Structure formats: structure tokens, C-alpha cells
Amino acid sequence: MVREEVAGSTQTLQWKCVESRVDSKRLYYGRFILSPLRKGQADTVGIALRRALLGEIEGTCITRAKFGSVPHEYSTIAGIEESVQEILLNLKEIVLRSNLYGVRDASICVKGPRYITAQDIILPPSVEIVDTAQPIANLTEPIDFCIDLQIKRDRGYQTELRKNYQDGSYPIDAVSMPVRNVNYSIFSCGNGNEKHEILFLEIWTNGSLTPKEALYEASRNLIDLFLPFLHAEEEGASFEENKNRFTPPLFTFQKRLTNLKKNKKGIPLNCIFIDQLELTSRTYNCLKRANIHTLLDLLSKTEEDLLRIDSFRMEDRKHIWDTLEKHLPIDLLKNKLSF
């Protein structure tokens, strides 16, 4: 982080992209500006965005590779220049672009002699290779070479215990981080008591998404994180009503639904978030992956819609129904969900 003094003027808060370039297929760069900010706000925004960009953006990676009869990852395969470990490292570097959730299968099946590149990977329709020229292996002899792959969308750095698999399957330590680096600098402007700050944000990505897309997703994640605090007034928890209480009332799912059934001021269904339903972490994650964030989103889905969600099971369906049945009018449930 860099802080400098520059001349500037006071305007309505706004942001824009001041520089954008593509250095290579796997290196995009963007520079953004946000101004004017009061003293201290630039640091607050810069720190939050940097952490969200580096840790909260999801990416798609190859997470597992299955060879034929290979005793361990340091083995060599006749007719292939690289060892199994080198092939795994090359697969780890492949950059993919997709919006898929859950695990997907892919494969490579070629005949040598020839170079194998990312272009030779047979992918599901929802996945795209960013740089098809990325190397994987070099077949030096006329042999048939096949690899079964698993692809997964996740965030952060995923590691698995190293061990030999009898079926020739090996995990790959996936780096699901589309944003390669983030830097921000702060510039002070104005004179006397009219000083303001300008935030410059630099973003480098691996090509699976643009810096602008990454900034949008990080901002969306931060907004979602703070959304529950924006509905405090809807709970009727005003300061005057609670100033003598030691602990403020919790914004629980049960209380929201009680207000809903009393049909008083009516809490909108889109203001009740699924993280307040006290669901299991498994059921909650399934719904989030399907972009179901509120009770309105959930009640808009049919049973068939839910069962089409990746990894969603009948047990999850029953768990959701049991939770809603205890709190919502049965007529509403019958109209919305055909469980």
C-alpha cells in the first residue's frame, strides 16, 4: 500500500477503470479508481476488497488425475518424456473457465508420438480452456495414452494427503484462485479541512475472468456478507425499544416467520435468508451453489428443481420441509413446494 499527496477536487463518490490490458492469455491487468473518500475510508475499502479478491473468488481447477497401472507419482511411463509427477504439475497449471458446481469428469486420450497440450483435454460443455497451448506431456513413441480427470469449482488452496492409489488415481493440490495479485495505493487530495482520499486498485487475474469481473464478484460477496445488518429496522428492534436491554434480540428465522404469520407489517420473503433456517451445512451449501439465497428463492423452486441441484439428496429435501412446516402456514407451502 502506497500513500501520496496529490491535487484533487470534491465530487460525488464514483469509480472507473483507468487502465486495462491483456499481457497474455493467462495474465490480465486492470487498474481502478474510487474517489473521493473521507480520510481513513480508502484503507477500509482497500483492505476489504484485497482480502475478498484473493480469498473469496471461486475458480475451476483439475483436482484429480487417474492413470493406468502406475505404482506411484514418481514413476515414469515408457514412451513419455515426463514423469507422472511432472504431468500432475502441468495439469495443476491448466487454467479453466466455467460456472459449474460440483465435480465434473474430463479426459485425455491420444496416440503418440506427439506433444499433449491443454487442447487435447475432452471437457464437459460447461468448461472452457483459457490457454489451449499449455503443455502437459510429450509422447516420444507410438503409444496410446489416456488420463481420466476430475474438475471442481472451489475457492482458495486445496490440499490432500499424499498417498498411492491402487487404481492409479492421484490428487492434485488445486489452486482455485483466479486473482493472482492485488495491490492498492491511496492518494490524498485537497487542502485544510477539505482533504479527501483517492483509492487506486490494481488487479491481476489468470485469464479465467477479467479484473472487472473479479472486482464485481468480490464486491458482491462483501455486500452479501453485510446484508443481514441492513434489515435491522424490519425487525422492529429500534434503539428506543432496546436501549435498556443488555443483549439486543437475535434476528432469528423463527421471529421473522412469526411476524409473517401474524400478517402485520409483513416481512418480505426476500428478506429472510436461508442461513437463518438453521439448516445443516451440507443442505445450506447445496442451496447456495444453486443461487438460492432467500426464502423467496427457495419457495420459488419446485421439488424437481431442488433435486436437480448437484449433490442434493432426498434427506436434504425432507430436512428443508420439516424446518418450513414448523413455521410457515401449510397452505403457503402447498402452493409453493410440491414435496
From Swiss-Prot:
Cite the entry's keywords alphabetically. Answer: Chloroplast, DNA-directed RNA polymerase, Nucleotidyltransferase, Plastid, Transcription, Transferase
What broad class of enzyme is this?
transferase
* Location of region: Alpha N-terminal domain (alpha-NTD): 10-233
Report which superkingdom the organism of origin falls in. Eukaryota
| Entry keyword Transferase | yes
Provide a GO CC annotation, any one.
Answer: DNA-directed RNA polymerase complex
Catalysis: reaction(s): RNA(n) + a ribonucleoside 5'-triphosphate = RNA(n+1) + diphosphate
- Pfam families, from UniProt? RNA_pol_A_bac, RNA_pol_A_CTD, RNA_pol_L
Q: What is its EC number?
A: 2.7.7.6
For the keyword Plastid, the answer is yes
Which GO BP annotation is one of this protein's?
DNA-templated transcription
Q: What does this protein do?
A: DNA-dependent RNA polymerase catalyzes the transcription of DNA into RNA using the four ribonucleoside triphosphates as substrates.
Subunit description: In plastids the minimal PEP RNA polymerase catalytic core is composed of four subunits: alpha, beta, beta', and beta''. When a (nuclear-encoded) sigma factor is associated with the core the holoenzyme is formed, which can initiate transcription.
Q: Which NCBIfam families match?
A: rpoA (TIGR02027)
Q: Which family does it belong to?
A: Belongs to the RNA polymerase alpha chain family.
Task: Return the HAMAP family for the record.
Answer: RNApol_bact_RpoA (MF_00059)
> Could you tell me what this protein is called?
DNA-directed RNA polymerase subunit alpha
Q: Which gene encodes it?
A: rpoA
